[in-house]
Design a protein with these regions (language model features):
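Carbohydrate transferase catalytic cores enriched for Leloir-type hexosyltransferases
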Residues: 1-375
Length: 375
């Protein structure tokens, strides 16, 4: 198969869907088959993907664009580029595809927040993405979601034929593991000015992640005499000022640390240094950070919503969304009970081994084959 991959949505600092783009392309390129991959990407794409030199990938480097102008380019210029490469199929990795294409197409939907929680997106994104996603759902030969939860949401919200939409869970990179190297840990601690004992959150600082709930529960933990600090890892998204303001309002500026964006190379060590990982999100299409935390041997607390029970299973604590009391109680339990901590560490590592990028690529390739056999 000659497969086109639209990776032009890959941002300079990948998180979430950006990591999916990187890891899927790496796994597809490493697979032992005769497929030819043609990757459409902006200028930083090859460096971010960091494929081995011997990997046979045809690069189509396009002009760097802002997210808004990229979407216009996708509709107006990408079809002509695709036609010139003579690919059998184009896989669009981030919600949308060109309205006109000279080949079969597959589109990945990461979540359905544009329909379920539109208030969690900027006005510009609310204006564009719902209609573009509906059009992609109609026009694509097949759709991929990253969890069964998102698949069911898409079927219900977009009236999609269930036979047209497939689930390919995300994976966890082998670099996310227990690390015993004290020198490396000291280096990362100094680099990000991390405290000795801390509760960790990782993700964009934005409304969907529901960080005020965590900050309020943590305030109660401080009032209870905890010595653990709270470390919030991730780039500032829209409305991040609300979180900073709440930290100041609750007089937690000396107890809460903001690191900003942390590179993928450093993340495994940051996880390894944490005593507990908390992910209080309102909705997730998958929730990759909880899987990475479990692989690194960190107990996990998250919300009983959308894909998270599907990913975590019995390997962590799930609480109701927006329940500060439940989050506080769960944090007290895990931090205060070493036997329980060790149990969650063991179960989490076992659970994380069920997910791999090789499996993601294998299932994705099966979708390609089915599309080309029936189109």
């Amino acid at each position: 198969m000659r497969i086109g991959i639209d990776a032009t949505a890959l941002p300079p600092q990948p998180v979430g869907a950006g990591n999916y783009i990187i890891q899927l392309i790496r796994a597809l390129a490493a697979a032992d088959n005769d497929d030819q991959l043609v990757v459409f990407t902006q200028s930083k794409g090859p460096a971010l993907l960091d494929l081995p030199e011997e990997t046979s990938v045809e690069w189509q480097i396009v002009k760097d664009r802002t997210p808004g102008s990229r979407l216009i380019w996708e509709q107006t210029r990408l079809p002509r580029l695709v036609q010139g490469t003579k690919v059998d199929l184009l896989h669009s990795l981030h919600y949308t595809r060109p309205m006109r294409l000279p080949c079969a197409s597959v589109v990945t939907f990461h979540d359905m927040t544009f329909f379920l929680y539109p208030q969690l997106h900027t006005r510009a994104r609310r204006m564009f993405f719902p209609s573009a996603i509906r059009a992609s759902a109609r026009q694509a030969d097949a759709l991929i979601t990253v969890s069964e939860s998102t698949r069911q949401d898409a079927i219900r919200l977009l009236a999609i034929d269930p036979g047209k939409i497939f689930t390919t869970h995300l994976g966890v990179d082998p670099s996310f593991r227990l690390i015993d190297n004290d020198d490396e840990k000291k280096t990362i601690t100094a680099k990000y000015d991390l405290p000795e004992n801390f509760v960790l959150y990782l993700g964009t600082i934005e409304p969907r992640k529901n960080l005020p709930i965590l900050v309020r529960a943590y305030r109660r933990l401080v009032d209870n005499g905890t010595s653990y600090k709270l470390v919030l890892v991730g780039k500032y998204g829209w409305m991040y000022e609300d979180v900073l303001g709440l930290v100041k309002e609750l007089d937690l500026e000396d107890m809460v640390c903001f690191t900003g964006y942390v590179s993928q190379d450093d993340l495994p060590l940051v996880y390894n240094l944490a005593s507990l990982f908390v992910y209080p999100t309102i909705y997730e299409g998958f929730g990759l950070p909880v899987l990475e935390a479990m692989a690194c041997g960190v107990p996990v607390i998250s919300t009983q919503i959308a894909s998270l029970p599907e990913i975590i299973g019995d390997a962590g604590i799930l609480i109701p969304v927006n329940d500060v009391d439940a989050l506080f109680d769960a944090m007290v339990r895990v931090l205060g009970d070493q036997t329980l901590r060790e149990e969650f560490i063991r179960y989490g590592q076992l659970r994380s081994k069920k997910f791999s990028w090789e499996r993601t690529a294998q299932l994705t390739r099966q979708v390609y084959q089915q599309v080309l056999e029936t189109s």
